[in-house]
Amino acid sequence: MPLFIPEDYTAKLAPETMEQAITYLKEIFPDMLARRLRLRRVTAPLFVLSGTGINDDLNGVERAVSFPIRDLGDRRAEVVHSLAKWKRMKLGTYKIAPGYGLYTDMNAIRADEELDNIHSLYVDQWDWER
């Protein structure tokens, strides 16, 4: 579905009020999520080294945004677009017991995302795994 904004659309909140609401939710949501689902917070990577298999390509056709890292001999890194594999690795690394899990605030870029009213190239989402 392409981006669609009705001609008679009016925002319910002023832009600064919307930003305050987003900030409020980003402050209270993780605590509630962690308590209810027995999760601990972990910091997500913004990028991972190419070729490690950590950057989950979702359906097999996504092209990762990548760049060379000079101090690693120009090895390439990829901006994450999914943390599915990374989260499962962290569950094992931290030896998180069954019934418990982890969550993160993932920031990603999905260059091949089909853009519409709810999908963007930039992704800012809560992500969790148990």
Model-predicted regions and their roles:
Residues L121-Q125:
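Short, solvent-exposed loop/turn segments at the edges of secondary structure
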Residues P2-H119, E129:
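Class II aminoacyl-tRNA synthetase-like tRNA-binding/catalytic domains
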